[in-house]
C-alpha cells in the first residue's frame, strides 16, 4: 500500500499542490493501481515472446502534401489575443 507521504513526494516532483481530499483520493487510486500491477506480476509469462506491438506494424501515415488553408485574418479572428498579424500567447519560458 502506498503512503500519503509518498503521494506528497510524487505530487511535489510533478509540481502539484494537492488538497487533503485529493491526497486521500490519489493515495487510494495509486494503491489500487499498484495492487493491480502486483496481480499482473503474478501471471505466468513463460513461453510468451516479448513484443512491443500487438498488431502488425505498417505505415499508416500519408504523404505530406501542400494544401490550401484559411486566410491569416480569418484564423486570427478566433484568437483571444493578437499583435501585428500574429497570435499572441503567454510566455512560458523565463527570460
Swiss-Prot record:
Native species: Halothermothrix orenii (strain H 168 / OCM 544 / DSM 9562)
Function description? Allows the formation of correctly charged Asn-tRNA(Asn) or Gln-tRNA(Gln) through the transamidation of misacylated Asp-tRNA(Asn) or Glu-tRNA(Gln) in organisms which lack either or both of asparaginyl-tRNA or glutaminyl-tRNA synthetases. The reaction takes place in the presence of glutamine and ATP through an activated phospho-Asp-tRNA(Asn) or phospho-Glu-tRNA(Gln).
Q: What family does the Swiss-Prot or TrEMBL record give for this protein?
A: Belongs to the GatC family.
Q: Which BP terms from GO are recorded? A: glutaminyl-tRNAGln biosynthesis via transamidation; regulation of translational fidelity; translation
Q: Which GO terms describe its molecular function?
A: asparaginyl-tRNA synthase (glutamine-hydrolyzing) activity; ATP binding; glutaminyl-tRNA synthase (glutamine-hydrolyzing) activity
| Subunit description | Heterotrimer of A, B and C subunits.
Which key words tag this protein in UniProt? Answer: ATP-binding, Ligase, Nucleotide-binding, Protein biosynthesis
Q: Give the EC class as a word.
A: ligase
Under catalytic activity, the entry for this protein gives: L-glutamyl-tRNA(Gln) + L-glutamine + ATP + H2O = L-glutaminyl-tRNA(Gln) + L-glutamate + ADP + phosphate + H(+); L-aspartyl-tRNA(Asn) + L-glutamine + ATP + H2O = L-asparaginyl-tRNA(Asn) + L-glutamate + ADP + phosphate + 2 H(+)
Q: What is this protein called?
A: Aspartyl/glutamyl-tRNA(Asn/Gln) amidotransferase subunit C
**Which Gene3D superfamilies does the record match to this protein?**
Glu-tRNAGln amidotransferase C subunit, N-terminal domain
Q: What is its EC number?
A: 6.3.5.-
Supply the Pfam families for this chain. GatC
Q: Which domain of life is it from?
A: Bacteria
User: In the UniProt record, does the keyword Ligase occur?
Assistant: yes
Amino acid at each position: 500500500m502506498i503512503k500519503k507521504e509518498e503521494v506528497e513526494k510524487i505530487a511535489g516532483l510533478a509540481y502539484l499542490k494537492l488538497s487533503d481530499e485529493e491526497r486521500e483520493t490519489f493515495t487510494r487510486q495509486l494503491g489500487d493501481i499498484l495492487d493491480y500491477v502486483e496481480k499482473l506480476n503474478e501471471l505466468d509469462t513463460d513461453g510468451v515472446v516479448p513484443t512491443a506491438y500487438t498488431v502488425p506494424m505498417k505505415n499508416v501515415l500519408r504523404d505530406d502534401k501542400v494544401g490550401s488553408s484559411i486566410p491569416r485574418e480569418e484564423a486570427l479572428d478566433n484568437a483571444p489575443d493578437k499583435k501585428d498579424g500574429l497570435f499572441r500567447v503567454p510566455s512560458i519560458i523565463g527570460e
